[in-house]
A protein has these predicted regions:
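Sec-dependent signal peptide recognition
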Residues: 1-8
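N-terminal signal peptide c-region/cleavage motif recognized by signal peptidases
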Residues: 13-15
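Alpha-helical substrate-recognition element adjacent to the catalytic core
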Residues: 19-176, 189-192, 257-261
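A short alpha/beta connector and helix-capping loop motif
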Residues: 64-76, 229-251
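Structural beta-sheet core signal
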Residues: 128, 218, 243-245
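Short, surface-exposed basic-aromatic patches at helix termini and helix-loop junctions that form
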Residues: 142-149, 206-210, 230-239
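Conserved Lys-Pro-Asp/Glu-containing loop-to-beta segment of HAD-superfamily phosphomonoesterases
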Residues: 198-229
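Low-complexity, Gly/Ser/Thr/Pro-rich intrinsically disordered linker/tail segments
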Residues: 250-286
Length: 286
């Protein structure tokens, strides 16, 4: 721990070296400790959070990150087609959205909300950065409200989020990032990327805001997103970026992707849901 403190202090003294520092943590108590030891000005600090398996997680395997990654990989590789829920990507998105509506989510750690409330009370700014697309916007808002990510009747991300040069904190239209081919949406403090690169997305956001950000804490459960942040910010000498790989849910994700028994159970659960949908919806596409 003294070494970490020394390293961080040295970065502030010598800004030319202030690039990206990597961490691998499995609790928000540890993230809170990291934040406190950093001792940066909260008003120039941006905390960026992934949603799925970082802030919130499915209460059962069906519809979870592990389930999605398993199915998406099967579609990509063409391997084991008999294990696919559907060979069509857009249909898989629709299935995911149904499961989001049916299955409850919960916070990944009991310290998630206390930490977010604490840092935002100090003046820190927060941003949600999710791989979900616009199709999941309604379900996402419902899940966050159900788990008390709110300040009064507003989402915490909206109330304590970024302020853009147009003085808005919630853009109802598309978020224009020229490097992206897919439609990216920013609403109520959350950026819906539809799978686009998170490092490039964060660079795009920073180019459009009013606030001067000096420190970023990025927290995500996926290694690929940690790598993306590293590539995007490794040459940014004006920022200190703490790149946190949050690993608490990773074992659960891998088990879903590699355990045939769990996979069979997921098929059976989905078939029950699908049959029920076919009974109540005429000419269901499922």
């Amino acid at each position: 721990m003294p070494f970490i403190l020394f390293l961080i202090c040295s970065l502030f003294i010598n800004p030319i070296f202030a690039r990206v520092i990597h961490y691998e943590l499995d609790s928000f108590a540890d993230i809170a400790t990291l934040y406190e030891e950093m001792r940066s000005d909260p008003r120039s600090t941006l905390l960026v959070f992934d949603l799925d398996d970082t802030l919130i997680t499915m209460t059962q395997p069906l519809g979870s990150v592990g389930w999605w990654d398993w199915q998406a990989e099967l579609q990509k590789t063409g391997k084991d087609p008999d294990k696919l829920f559907t060979p069509d990507y857009q249909q898989l998105v629709r299935i995911q959205n149904i499961l989001f509506q049916l299955i409850k989510m919960e916070v990944t750690d009991k310290y998630v909300l206390p930490f977010l409330n604490h840092v935002t009370d100090q003046g820190a700014i927060i941003l949600g950065l999710t791989a979900r697309g616009k199709d999941h916007l309604s379900a996402t808002m419902m899940q966050l409200k159900d788990n008390n990510f709110t300040v009064g009747d507003k989402l915490l991300f909206q109330e304590k989020g970024l302020k853009f040069r147009n003085n808005k904190t919630s853009l109802a239209d598309n978020f224009q990032c020229p490097q992206f081919s897919k439609e990216v949406i920013y609403q109520r403090g959350i950026m819906f990327l539809d799978g686009e690169d998170k490092g490039q997305a964060l660079l795009c956001v920073l180019s459009k805001i009013k606030t001067e950000i000096k420190t970023i804490i990025f927290v995500d459960d996926a290694k690929r997103n940690s790598v993306s942040i590293d590539k995007a910010f490794t040459d940014r000498n004006d920022l200190l970026v703490l790149n946190v790989l949050y690993t608490k849910e990773n074992t659960k994700e891998l088990e879903i992707q590699n355990n045939p028994l769990i996979q069979q159970q997921l098929f059976e659960q989905w078939n029950q849901i699908k049959n029920h949908l076919n009974e109540i919806i005429v000419q269901s596409n499922f």
